[in-house]
């Protein structure tokens, strides 16, 4: 929702302020790809953590750079939770997500830098025992500057305001805006990111809409003896 100010003509119109750079959540470098894998069967969702979290987040938050060994989320889109692939699938579809600074409004990733990010991710996966065969691999990247172009004013931040401190969720915008008929829901609105929180956000938006548009349903017209039609 941080893009609303840029998309609607300013924060005064929507009532949602853009988030300052230091208060943004993380962005990401993502790769939608198809490739063969070996080593062990992936489940539908897998996270390959860096063995040096302190160094990773020092790079992301202080040095504003990509970490050398990135924690890599892999969604194996063709697999079920038991790691089974449908019969006949050779190269499986995957989505890689690597954390990145939300600096898409001030920095553009070159083709070389994007390729280095993929190489670092593949090297990390290999060290964890998963080999992604690069022969015949096809991929499509999305970088923070691309996310910023899709959602102006965000720097590419994917989760709205950073969740620092116990009051962070209360600083996120609520469901209502100043624009009639526009309600906010999702991970960047109150109460915050993650499927359970986003579900609550959707429920709050639905409740707000119902309250704002509540009306008494008229009774069905009828005629009673000795009286008059009622509505």
Tell what function each PLM region has.
Residues 28-30, 79-82, 167, 187-197:
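Glycine-rich phosphate/pyrophosphate-binding beta-alpha loops
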């Amino acid at each position: 929702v941080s893009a609303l100010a840029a998309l609607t003509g300013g924060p005064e119109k929507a009532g949602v302020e853009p988030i300052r750079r230091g208060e943004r959540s993380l962005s990401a470098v993502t790769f939608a790809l198809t490739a063969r894998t070996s080593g062990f069967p992936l489940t539908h969702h897998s996270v390959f953590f860096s063995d040096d979290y302190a160094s990773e987040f020092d790079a992301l938050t202080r040095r504003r750079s990509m970490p050398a060994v990135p924690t890599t989320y892999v969604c194996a889109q063709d697999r079920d939770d038991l790691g089974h692939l449908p019969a006949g699938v050779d190269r499986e579809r995957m989505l890689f997500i690597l954390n990145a600074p939300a600096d898409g409004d001030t920095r553009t990733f070159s083709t070389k830098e994007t390729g280095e990010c993929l190489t670092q991710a593949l090297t990390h996966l290999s060290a964890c025992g998963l080999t992604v065969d690069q022969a015949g691999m096809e991929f499509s990247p999305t970088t923070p500057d691309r996310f910023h172009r899709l959602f102006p004013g965000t720097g590419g931040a994917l989760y709205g305001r950073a969740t620092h401190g116990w009051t962070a969720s209360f600083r996120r915008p609520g469901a209502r805006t100043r624009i009639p008929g526009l309600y906010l829901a999702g991970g960047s609105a109150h109460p915050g990111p993650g499927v359970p929180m986003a579900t609550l956000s959707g429920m709050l938006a639905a409740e707000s809409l119902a309250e704002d548009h509540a009306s008494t349903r008229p009774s069905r017209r009828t005629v009673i003896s000795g009286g008059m039609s009622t509505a």
